[in-house]
Amino acid sequence: AIEGGNGVKVNKIHKADSPNYLFIDVNILKDAAPGTYYFVFSKDGKPEFKYPYEIAARESGSVQRKSYTAADMIYLIMPDRFANGDPSNDSTSDTAEKSDRSKYFGRHGGDIQGIIDHLDYIEDLGATAIWCTPLLEDNEPDGSYHGYACSDYYHIDPRFGSNELYREMVAKAHEKGLKVVMDIVTNHCG
């Protein structure tokens, strides 16, 4: 069941081979009100726990947002290997893998600030869009630099920066007329 309003409907529930996983197909209705909805998980007809599901308010003008065309030149960036604009975030106490430039598959320290610092360079190349490999948290003990084993779909990996710094990067890219692709991999995670 869902609590919090009539804006979200459960279409189907899929049980996985493992009892640790459950997949839920939902339909977010066109008139769904922004807010927090709750999936209510029950056992033997009695509620066991609730899981929050937030629907944010649509940003003004988001429907008119320009898309990408064949005329765009997209510059692909692997942030960890691009530029280190803030060495203080190369290793954090909250993440498993620490920066080690001597390891080929280790983290090398590139970050969002490094991208911001080089937006003029990207613009001068003639790029019209930036596509960063995933910047969301990838808290694997090894090989986490590429970001393709996301462990938190809501937060930028602290070794890259913060959600606020990501928004700043996008705003500064837009000021230069650069579009930004946010790469997110949802079919496998860490």
Mark where each language-model region is:
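A short, small-residue-rich loop immediately preceding and capping a beta-strand
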Residues: 185
